[in-house]
Design a protein with these regions (language model features):
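Catalytic core of nucleotide-activated saccharide and alditol-phosphate transferases
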Residues: 1-134
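Catalytic binding pocket for nucleotide-activated donors in carbohydrate/polymer assembly enzymes
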Residues: 6-8, 12-14, 29-37, 41-42, ...
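Alpha-helical packing segments of well-folded alpha/beta enzyme cores
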Residues: 27, 158-162, 201
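A Trp-anchored, charged/polar loop motif used as the substrate-binding/catalytic surface
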Residues: 49-59, 156-157, 191-196
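Conserved hydrophobic/aromatic pocket- or pore-lining residues that grip, position, or stack substrates
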Residues: 68, 166, 227
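Short, flexible/disordered intra-domain loops and linkers
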Residues: 80-87, 147-152, 188-189
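Residues that form generic nucleotide/phosphate-binding pockets
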Residues: 94, 165, 169, 245
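Alpha-helix-centered segments that form part of catalytic cores
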Residues: 122-169, 175
Length: 257
């Protein structure tokens, strides 16, 4: 990224020397025509043998045992949307409204469809160091705003809201370096080491919770594969590709509202 906040991703995508693999089917459908024969759809996976070997090395640690757990960021500390400066009441109200509506819908991300030219222009004026992608036919301003800015904000709002609701009713444990002071009652045990501690959390938690980032439109995030590879039980938000690979109610459970 240059000092002007511009990146030329189109040349990287269309370069005949590059091969790109995407785990999100909808993203693949958008990008594949830009470089036929060089862009592929490939779901993620996990190294089950490695995960099981990490679990086998377990030395009992009560910090890594939980009834209901979530591992990951709340996105509160890295949300570019929060840099929005002095938006008008109408812009703020419109953005708050569409984000609130999206929070209630799983399996379909409609924010980009609701960003008019006027809203896009107003947003750009209020966003310092706006991330513009040079000469990109598919990453338009509306796509950037909906995915990079608003998508991250919705993910943050969703995670904080769900953690608040769950911690009021159940012993909720979170493994994160995010600030959880706004969530009373939650048990924040800090971050975990990806290769040594995280497999134990997934294996020994009674219920593992997955909340997919809104930037992943249809694909299955790595977190789901890792939890299942550790022999853990997972409840996830609904993603369109989940039923293509798993039997809901047998391999995995999902929530939709």
């Amino acid at each position: 990224r240059s000092g002007h906040g511009r990146m030329n991703v189109t040349s990287a995508i269309t370069n005949s020397c590059n091969y790109i693999f995407l785990f999100d089917q909808l993203q693949y459908q958008d990008i594949a025509p830009l470089n036929p024969g060089h862009i592929f759809y490939l779901p993620l996976a996990t190294d089950v043998a490695f995960m099981q070997s990490a679990i086998a090395k377990d030395v009992f640690d009560s910090r890594l045992r939980a009834d209901l757990s979530f591992v990951g960021s709340l996105y509160t500390e890295k949300c570019p949307y929060d840099k929005l400066q002095s938006p008008s009441d109408s812009l703020r109200g419109y953005l708050d409204g569409i984000m609130e509506a999206q929070l209630k819908v799983y399996g379909y991300y409609f924010i980009e469809d609701l960003l008019t030219d006027d809203i896009v222009a107003d947003f750009k004026r209020c966003m310092p160091d706006y991330l513009a992608l040079k000469d990109s036919p598919f990453l338009t301003d509306s796509a950037i705003i909906s995915k990079y800015y608003i998508g991250n904000k919705i993910s943050s709002l969703e995670r904080v809201s769900l953690m608040k609701q769950l911690s009021k009713r159940f012993p909720m444990t979170i493994y994160t370096n995010s600030d959880t002071s706004c969530i009373p009652g939650i048990d924040n045990r800090g971050g975990v080491m990806t290769r040594t501690e995280m497999p134990l959390v997934f294996h020994y938690s009674t219920i593992n919770l997955n909340m997919t980032s809104k930037g992943i439109r249809s694909g299955i995030p790595l977190r789901i594969w890792d939890i299942l590879g550790c022999g853990g039980f997972v409840i996830s938000n609904y993603q369109p590709e989940i039923p293509e690979y798993f039997s809901i109610g047998e391999d995995i459970e999902v929530y939709e509202s």
